[in-house]
């Protein structure tokens, strides 16, 4: 259930009691409503990200980009998605139908589950788990299995090579990513995403982990781009080499699943960069004191109650996340694609030792500080 303010939850429960609705039924309805709201929200986020990528890419190439479908072409992505869903769903005749059909779901579902532990704003989170960040790492590790299933089930050499590349790339960069997350957890003394943000907000903008973990921040950014298969790390679907990689044999809604999953994963990485390193919803700027503590009035049956500016914190989180999105989009059109051996060397020979050394230094610092 989405956590808003306690007063709001208490008043909703009072209304439920007045209407005679059982608490169990209300909990089920509220959970379903929360999940549907999340799905709708992240889907709208994907549409906005695709539109932004088209516009930014067009600007970097001195083109117009989407222009006519809706204001500033913002509905062009929606129209393209509808057209894609109306196409024929083709299944390879000699492929493994079970693996071919199940693979896209295995790839997309873990990405959706990652949103459960992301605090979109102050007290705006579906599930504040005590192991939130490692829940994200755990569900993300399921994705390579789905990629291998799609590559093998397609009965296509390009798809199979793309699946192998994707699995190798994901495994190679997930370890440095996890080590960076562990370093942040040591500094915050918690694995909860909410606790990590609150630990940074104690000291304002100077308390952000960006300043305390600059090396980890760089490793996390590079590993996140590799996990999202963004240029220069898009080897699993390199068009010049593998047609479309593990997506080669897919069409219609199944191909759309990969498309949605890719941008959802990019948004997840952007939000975790914000939560782990950029203070989440916190925006305590030295030249704007008290901005993070602006309150708004909320009218209820009990009178006027002051609550934290939840929606302001939501927009602050999104603005920070979209800064990372801009970096990833700009990198797509400025950096060349690396070779497979270079990608693996970067992950295993450089990022992994650096992330491990950063973790050891962080642990040593914490021991000296606490000792």
From Swiss-Prot:
Entry keywords, A to Z: Chloroplast, Membrane, NAD, NADP, Plastid, Plastoquinone, Quinone, Thylakoid, Translocase, Transmembrane, Transmembrane helix
Family the UniProt entry places it in: Belongs to the complex I subunit 1 family.
Subunit structure: NDH is composed of at least 16 different subunits, 5 of which are encoded in the nucleus.
Biological role stated in the UniProt entry: NDH shuttles electrons from NAD(P)H:plastoquinone, via FMN and iron-sulfur (Fe-S) centers, to quinones in the photosynthetic chain and possibly in a chloroplast respiratory chain. The immediate electron acceptor for the enzyme in this species is believed to be plastoquinone. Couples the redox reaction to proton translocation, and thus conserves the redox energy in a proton gradient.
Transmembrane segments: 32-52, 98-118, 129-149, 167-187, 255-275, 310-330, 350-370
EC number: 7.1.1.-
Any GO BP: photosynthesis, light reaction
Location of the protein in the cell: Plastid, Chloroplast thylakoid membrane
Catalytic activity from the UniProt record: a plastoquinone + NADH + (n+1) H(+)(in) = a plastoquinol + NAD(+) + n H(+)(out); a plastoquinone + NADPH + (n+1) H(+)(in) = a plastoquinol + NADP(+) + n H(+)(out)
A cellular component term, taken from the record's GO annotations: chloroplast thylakoid membrane
Source species of the chain: Psilotum nudum
Coiled coil spans: none
Name of this chain's protein: NAD(P)H-quinone oxidoreductase subunit 1, chloroplastic
Major enzyme class: translocase
InterPro entries documented for this protein: NADH_UbQ_OxRdtase_su1/FPO, NADH_UbQ_OxRdtase_su1_CS
Domain of life: Eukaryota
Membrane topology: Multi-pass membrane protein
GO molecular function, one term: oxidoreductase activity, acting on NAD(P)H, quinone or similar compound as acceptor
Pfam name, any one: NADHdh
Major localisation: plastid
């Amino acid at each position: 259930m989405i956590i808003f303010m306690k007063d709001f939850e208490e008043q909703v429960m009072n209304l439920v009691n007045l209407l005679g609705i059982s608490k169990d039924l209300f909990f089920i309805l509220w959970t379903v409503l929360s999940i549907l709201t999340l799905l709708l929200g992240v889907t709208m986020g994907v549409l906005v990200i695709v539109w932004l990528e088209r516009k930014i890419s067009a600007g970097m190439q001195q083109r117009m980009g989407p222009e006519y479908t809706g204001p500033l072409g913002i509905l062009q992505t929606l129209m393209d998605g509808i057209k894609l869903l109306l196409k024929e769903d083709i299944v390879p005749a000699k492929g493994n139908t079970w693996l071919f059909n199940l693979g896209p779901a295995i790839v997309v579902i873990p990405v959706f589950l990652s949103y459960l532990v992301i605090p979109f704003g102050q007290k705006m989170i579906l599930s504040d788990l005590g192991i939130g960040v490692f829940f994200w790492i755990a569900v993300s590790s399921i994705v390579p299995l789905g990629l291998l299933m799609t590559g093998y089930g397609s009965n296509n050499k390009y798809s199979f090579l793309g699946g192998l590349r994707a699995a190798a790339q994901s495994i190679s960069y997930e370890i440095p990513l996890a080590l960076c997350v562990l370093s942040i957890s040591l500094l915050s003394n918690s694995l909860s995403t909410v606790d990590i943000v609150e630990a940074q907000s104690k000291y304002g903008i100077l308390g952000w982990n960006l300043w305390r973990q600059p090396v980890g921040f760089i490793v996390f950014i590079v590993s996140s781009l590799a996990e999202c298969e963004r240029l220069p790390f898009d080897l699993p679907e390199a068009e010049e080499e593998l047609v479309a990689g593990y997506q080669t044999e897919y069409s219609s809604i199944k191909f759309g699943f990969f498309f949605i999953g890719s941008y959802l994963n990019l948004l997840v990485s952007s939000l975790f960069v914000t939560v782990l390193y950029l203070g989440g919803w916190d925006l305590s700027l030295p030249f704007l004191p008290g901005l993070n503590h602006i309150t708004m009035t909320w009218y209820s049956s009990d009178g006027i109650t002051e609550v934290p500016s939840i929606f302001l914190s939501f927009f602050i989180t999104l603005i920070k996340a979209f800064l990372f999105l801009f970096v990833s989009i700009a990198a797509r059109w400025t950096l060349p694609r690396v070779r497979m051996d270079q990608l693996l060397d970067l992950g295993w020979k450089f990022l992994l030792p650096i992330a491990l050394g950063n973790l050891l230094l962080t642990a040593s610092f914490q021991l000296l500080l606490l000792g």
